[in-house]
Amino acid sequence: MLILAIISLITFVSMSKLSDNRAIIRLINIYLILVLVLDSFLYLLFLNNQTYTVMGELLIFNSFTFYIDMLIYFIMIVISSLYGYNLYNNNLYKTLFEPKKELIILFLINILGALLIVHSNDFITLFVAIELQSYSIYLITAIYNSSYKASKASMLYFFMGGILSILIAYSINTYYSVLNSYTLHSLDSLIINTLDLNLILIALSLGLLFKIGIAPLHKWLISIYENTPILITIYISLIPKISILSYLVLSNISINSLVISILAILTLLVGSVGGLLQIKIKRLLAFSGLTNAGYMMLLLLLNNNEFSYLYYITQYSISHLAIFMIIIFSIYYINYINNQYNPIIYVNQLKGLIHDNAYLVLSMAIVVFSFIGIPPLLGFFGKLNILMSILNNGYYFISIVLIVASLISALYYLYLLNVSIQDKNNILINSNETVSSVLSYILSSLIILITFGFIYNSLIIDIFNVYFN
C-alpha cells in the first residue's frame, strides 16, 4: 500500500496545476501521515509476522519490510516539513535552496525506488529499483549546481554510479548464466556453492555497498554531500543508505565474511580518523555517516541480525535528522553584521551559539552524546546491541576495532559541541524571525526520543520479539 501511495503522489504532483509549492507540500504531508496510520492498522490486522510475495514473487512483504517502509515515510515527512519551513521564510529559503516543483517529483520517484529496493525478491526488480533511485538522485544533485565544485560533484556521482551499476548488472547476468534464475531461492537447491557463485555474490554486494559510499570508495560521495544544499544532503545521506543496507540484511547475500569484515573495519577506521581532519560541518557529518555505515555493515556478518539492525538504523536516523535540524535552525542566530542569511559551512561559524540559543546547544549536546554512545541515550543501546551481537559470534578483533573507532569519532563529535559553547568572536545580529512552531515540536520530539530511550527500551525489545521472533 505504501508503494501504491507513492505512485499516486507522483501522478498527483505531475498533473497538478497548483503553482503554490506550499499547498502541494501540505497535501503531501497530510497524505503521508494518513497512509502511514492506515497502513499500520492494516499491518496489525492482516500481516502479523507473515511473509507474502506478489507479482510472481517479484516483491516480498513481511514485518521487516513494513518497518523499513514506516521509517522511510517518517523521514520523508520530517524532510518535507523542513522543505515547507524553507518556503515559509522568504529571507531564509535562498540560504538552503530555492524550491522547485520538479524536486518534489524527483524526491517521490526516489522514495519509490527506495521502497522497491527493500521489497525486491528478484534481481531484475532490484536492478530496476536501484536505477530508479540512482537516476533520480543524479537529477536531484544536478538541479542546484550553482558552482564549478557542485557541477563536478554531480558529474562524479553520475560517473561512479554508472560504473557501479555496470558491476551490479554484470553480476546479475553472470548469476543467471550459472543458475538460470534471477531469484535468491535458487541457492537453496544447491548442495555446494561454487567458487564462481561466491565471487558473483561478492561482486553484487560490493556494487551495492559502494553505492552508499563505503571505504575505500568514499571520497566521491563526501564531495557530493559537501556541494549540495543542506536539505538535499540530509536526504541523500540517509535514504539510499537505509534502502540498500536493508536489502542486504534481509536477503543475506553477503556470504563472504572475510570481504565484509575487511570493508567494515576499513570503513570504521576511515570514518573515525577522517572526521578528525574536517573543519566543514557537512564533511564532518559525512565521515560520521561513514562510521555509522561501518557499524551496520558488521551486522551483515551475522545471522538473525534483524533486531540489532532495525534498532540501530532507527536511532541513527533520529539522531541524523536531529543534528541537521539543529544546524539549519542555527542559521536564524548566526546572522552576520549585514543582517544577511548565510549558509553555515564551517564548524567555527557555530562559535558562541550557546549565547544566542541555549536550547539548540543543549539539543546538540544530547545528539552528540547519543552519537558517541553515552548511556542512557538511545545511541548507547544501538551500539551495545551491535557489540554484543558480534561478541556472541566470536568476532573479538572486530569488537576491539568498533570500540576504538567509537572512541576516536567521539573526539570530532565533542569538537562540534565545544565550538558552540565558546565565547563569540564576531558581531551578531539576532533575527526577528522565529523557528516554525511545527518544526520546533518535531525537533523536540526527536530529542525526547533520544533522551528517554532507556525508558521505552524494554518496550521496543518486546515489540520486536513479538513481530520479528
Curated annotation (Swiss-Prot):
Complex I is composed of 37 different subunits. Belongs to the complex I subunit 2 family. Its EC number is 7.1.1.2. Pfam families: Proton_antipo_M. Core subunit of the mitochondrial membrane respiratory chain NADH dehydrogenase (Complex I) that is believed to belong to the minimal assembly required for catalysis. Complex I functions in the transfer of electrons from NADH to the respiratory chain. The immediate electron acceptor for the enzyme is believed to be ubiquinone. Its main location: mitochondrion. GO terms for cellular component: mitochondrial inner membrane. One of its GO terms (molecular function) is NADH dehydrogenase (ubiquinone) activity. It comes from Yarrowia lipolytica (strain CLIB 122 / E 150) (Yeast). The gene is ND2. This is NADH-ubiquinone oxidoreductase chain 2.
